[in-house]
Amino acid sequence: MGFMSAKLFPSCESMCVCCPALRPSSRRPVKRYKKLLAEIFPKTPDGLPNERKIMKLCEYAAKNPLRIPKIAKFLEQRSHKELRSAHVNFIKIITEAYSKLLFICKEQMAYFAISLVNVLTELLESKQENIHILGCQTLAKFIYSQVDNTYARNIESLVRKVCVLSRQQGVEHSLLRAASLQCLSAMIWFMKEHSYIFVDFDEIVQSVLENYRVEESAAGDEERHAPQHNWVDEIVRREGRAGLGGGNDVNCNSTAIRLRSARDSSALTREERESPEVWAHICVQKLAELAKESTTMRRILDPMLSYFDKKKQWAPRQGLALLVLSDMSYLEKSSGNEQLILTSVIRHLDHKNVLYDPQIKSDMIQTATLLARQLRSRGIAAELVVAGDLCRHLRKTLEAMESASIEELNLNESLQNFLQDCLLEVVTGINDVRPLYDMMAITLENLPSMPVVARASIGSLLILSHIISLTSMSLNAPMLFPEALLQQILKSMVHPDVDTRVGAHHMFSAVIVQGPSRQRSESDFLYETKKWQSRTTSVFASATALLEKLRREKESLGSDKTGNMDDEKEKSISEEENKHVWARKNSAYFSKLVFSFTDRYAALTSSAEEANIVMLTEDQKNQLLSAFWVQAIQTDNTPFNYEAIGHSYSLTVISSRLKDSRNSNNIQFFQLPLSLRSVSLTSNGVLSPSCQRSIFTLATSMLAFAGKVCHITELFDVLRCFTSCNMDPYLRIGEDLQLYVRLQSDLGNYGSDSDQEIARSVLSDCRTKVGINDQRVLDVVACALCNLTEMDKDVLVKELTEMFTPEEVPLFGSNSAFDWANFHVQAFSDESLSFDEECSRTSSVDGGLHESPITNTGSSISKTTMPQSVPRVLGVGQLLESALHVAGQVAGASVSTSPLPYGTMTSQCEALGSGTRKKLSSWLVNGHDSTPDNPAPSLPSAQHFIIPKVNSCGFESSIRTTLEPCSAVKLPPASPFDNFLKAAYRAQ
């Protein structure tokens, strides 16, 4: 053997220089990695790891990647062995070796990744906490070294194991929770970087929230509400606002949130790295970074909101929801999806977990209010859909209060207050409120016919209207009344439910008056209104007086201040229940709703601020006057309906600027109350004496108020005998000449047999008084209007004596208004103009400011004798000839041929549509001939009459009485495009 090694091998080596088997063993790489692997472990289990040898092993693996699988296999086998022996120090060396491989051999990860995943699985399934910590830390390093989704499924398989470790309770497990949360933060980073959502993502979110709660519970209320972190108080201080908290839960302004800035996980101190609370905040921070899109945001918020429901963490002071969501919102500023958090919270109110729990809903709304205020402080406006959802929930709350028990009523009332707070914060942050008006119009368009639902819908929109009015001083509020909203409000004013009609008038008042409210004392409210102080103050007082009076009704009926109240208090409950329901319940519905809101938010307004009145267009004024006419002659009206009509009329008068000579509605504003007076004093079988008495009081109030606005002082002296007397036990005219309900009266007795007898006697006396001073009233009004309109007095008297007819028939339906003009058959026949004469007077597009309105297709309800002439129906040929005749007159008008701007063109289109179409429709309805040879109309026989009755289908139906309807034919209205073509043709 010595000969072979000493003589033979050297000789072979000198001859076979290329034989690798003959190289020295020190130069052979086959055995070297085993030696390096053996050197990284100390001689004893307690020995320190050799960092230099570990680094040398990794460098060797980087230079010899084909050896990495064998190195990984050795480490995996050694880890199994040491786990069985519970040698934690050796396991730590193995994990350190894998960590160095991840750092140095990143490009060769495919050679050892699966082996590392197997080792991590064994570590996480171990029973020792130290080994769990090593596994979590190594897994975090493995995740951060990923460059793609190759090992996403392998990482996903370990999510549940890490989440279980993160939920270990107790202070002794804080290091384990910190390590597991560090691993979870790495997983969230992986999902953000590689757009991959784990299947067990909900488990990650809940694990993070479990540790977030530990931090906040340990922090204590003192730190949570520390003044130096109170951003809410800073907002309140700058805005000069008082507390808005309504209810016993929490004052929103006294609740502060610690908004923490983002943390850098690589720059943490040792104490911070060992704190699970710090890592929980980092996880929330990375969740906010993960929510790049709205879909991802919802994916994150869904498990969060479900966790808050399950753990009852919605309370603003003791709960976790406000803390987490505020941090999410604050840290989400880079993506621009902050408002989605508020939207998701509001939509979560419909979730089955909280749908039937008013207390949890109240806590959620308080949280949403603070989130909305936080967004507003950063200049971020909430989505408009949030306001719509809040109104919907407010409607549900109001609807539930109709038939709730006392306990449920208190909970719903608290929820309602919090909804108002949240709605106020949302609307305050919206710069342009016009989309809100559009949303209100859409809601009113689909207003149901059921009284309870309709009242709740109107109530929610009424609160929104007052909020918009309250915040309109700082918003870009429109100077003109929204057209679409007005159309739907007018439609709601003829709703089947009488209280819904009152609510529609309240909405009109809240929208047309923008600015702070002026509170009135109870004594002034109960017995007399405040004196006329200024235009603006009285306007808003008029808009809110009705609501306040309704709210005070039950208190006044139940108090013992006067003898009348004592008498009503002594009445039995059964007698009151037999009365009309509206008199004791629904009459105070909207007042309790709105004035609770007004009282709570009175501190938000400054006494120096003045209210603004939204302007109305000419068409809108005509529609409102027509609406007041239609509503005033409804047979089921209550005193509150007449009061609402009177207040809406007063606001319309003030908005119309009657003292302006350019106002084309001056005559109609006086013609309407004069016509209502004539209707109230005309005996007929449709309106009851009680209604006629109320209409007379309403007409007197309207006439006196219009005269005061126009400074016709003599008119007030003439009407003093009607304004100061107590002829109506249910309605009175205050010192401001507006109509008010006598709340101390027995409202349930309105319309009874005894009341009808009293009303007949009162009407008889009124006929005598009116006959004496009627001509005097006409002279005074005509003389005053002469100076405003520059028209002849005789012409004004003639127009004032004509019966008012509604302008916009299609708005209320074909049979919704009464043709009261047939009360004066002979006068109408003598004074009527032929169609050609009327067209010649109003053929100019820009002229004819005082055009005759459209006469309603309904015939007179009077029982007086009328000519028994058969109505003549025009043929198709005659209708076409009439239309061509009018078109020829319009086309032949002298117009400048120069190019017109778009605004002028649209004005001509509107004038054309509201001019010639009215003349033609008025002529057709009244039965004029197509030639000027026969100017007298053919009046129908009075056998039947159609009384408008609202129902669920558009709120209208027809009820036939013993009168015959007149047959009338009307051309269909021209489309806006036709009007534009006609105006464009004229401009050429």
Swiss-Prot record:
The protein, known as: Protein SEMI-ROLLED LEAF 2
Residue runs in coiled coils: none
GO biological process terms held by the UniProt record: cell differentiation; pollen development
UniProt xrefs under Pfam families: EFR3_ARM (PF21052)
Top-level taxonomy: Eukaryota, Viridiplantae, Streptophyta, Embryophyta, Tracheophyta
Phenotype caused by lack of the gene: Inward rolled leaves due to the presence of defective sclerenchymatous cells on the abaxial side of the leaf. Narrow leaves and reduced plant height.
Keywords: Cytoplasm, Developmental protein, Differentiation, Nucleus
InterPro entries membership: ARM-type_fold (IPR016024), EFR3-like_ARM (IPR049152), SRL2-like (IPR055296)
GO CC terms: cytoplasm; nucleus; plasma membrane
Known tissue expression: Expressed in root tips, and in the vascular bundles of leaf blades, leaf sheaths, and roots, especially in their sclerenchymatous cells.
